[in-house]
């Protein structure tokens, strides 16, 4: 309990100082590391952009001072794989980095495969937390259903582990993750301290801006993708060729309690999600029919 109080105090204090430009990054990570030298948390990390992605490596650099990290990530981009698993052929993994408190594997499978492999073969002990990300791109609203980053944390939640997905609304390979650092530590520490109910996880999205207005706890906005298919010249190839593209259509643009609203107004959007897809509101009507 004392350890939890220290974590809670520090995460709030660090974010306050950072927001007022009073706490340099080196002091931030050093101060956390001082309190975490014993009984360091053990965190499993994966993503859908691959083990070489900037977002993943920024996350590693941020959290390695406060936790022991096991990273099992795809060996290349796997965006849009959601919770897909590989069953038609074997997968393989290669150790690509090993140092004190950090082990990194590159896996040929999907993000969900990576979590399954880690939990069944590579963990030293049961992880205290599983993190997906940092994703290059927006995983708010309906995007969460397609996301391999969310696939990571959903698989963890299925296994009874607390899990958090981090995404930045910037698809650039050279995206600037610097403003995220204190929030990554703060949210990670709070997730470690408080835990999460079984079969739930957090979807955390950061807007693309140099400084955030704060954190908003919000629901998923209702939206859908439209204009999703673009014709492509077949260039002599057989059959019809297309690009899957599209525009995200907001279905409730005036709602102020959604992740899309929070992001558009400069807030970090934290959305609690659940694995239970039951439409409970439909049950009374269906029972009356059957």
PLM features: residue spans?
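Extreme N-terminal basic, low-complexity initiation segments
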Residues: 1-13
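A cross-family phosphate/adenosyl-ligand binding-site feature
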Residues: 38-39, 43, 54-121, 125-126
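Glycine/threonine-rich flexible loop motifs
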Residues: 138-147
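Electrostatically charged, flexible surface regions
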Residues: 177-290
């Amino acid at each position: 309990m004392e350890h939890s109080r220290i974590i809670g105090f520090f995460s709030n204090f660090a974010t306050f100082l950072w927001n007022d430009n009073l706490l340099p990054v080196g002091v931030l990570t050093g101060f956390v590391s001082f309190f975490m030298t014993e009984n360091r948390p053990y965190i499993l990390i994966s993503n859908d952009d691959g083990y070489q992605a900037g977002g993943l490596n920024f996350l590693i650099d941020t959290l390695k001072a406060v936790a022991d990290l096991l990273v099992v990530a795809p060996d290349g981009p796997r965006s849009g794989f959601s919770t897909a698993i590989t069953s038609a052929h074997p997968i393989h993994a290669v150790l690509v980095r090993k140092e004190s408190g950090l082990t990194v594997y590159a896996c040929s499978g999907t993000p969900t495969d990576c979590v399954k492999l880690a939990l069944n073969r590579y963990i030293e002990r049961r992880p205290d937390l599983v993190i997906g990300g940092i994703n290059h791109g927006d995983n708010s609203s309906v995007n969460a259903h397609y996301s391999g980053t969310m696939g990571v944390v959903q698989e963890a939640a299925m296994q009874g582990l607390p899990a958090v997905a981090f995404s930045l609304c910037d698809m650039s390979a050279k995206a600037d993750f610097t403003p995220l650092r204190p929030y990554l530590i703060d949210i990670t520490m709070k997730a470690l301290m408080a835990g999460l109910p079984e079969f739930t996880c957090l979807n955390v999205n950061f807007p693309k801006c140099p400084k955030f207005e704060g954190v908003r706890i919000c629901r998923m906005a209702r939206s859908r993708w439209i204009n999703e298919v673009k014709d492509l010249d077949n260039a002599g190839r057989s059959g019809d060729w297309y690009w899957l593209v599209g525009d995200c259509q907001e279905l409730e643009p005036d709602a102020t309690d959604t992740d899309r609203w929070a992001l558009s107004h400069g807030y970090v959007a934290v959305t609690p999600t659940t694995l239970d897809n039951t439409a409970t509101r439909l049950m009374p009507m269906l029972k009356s029919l059957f």
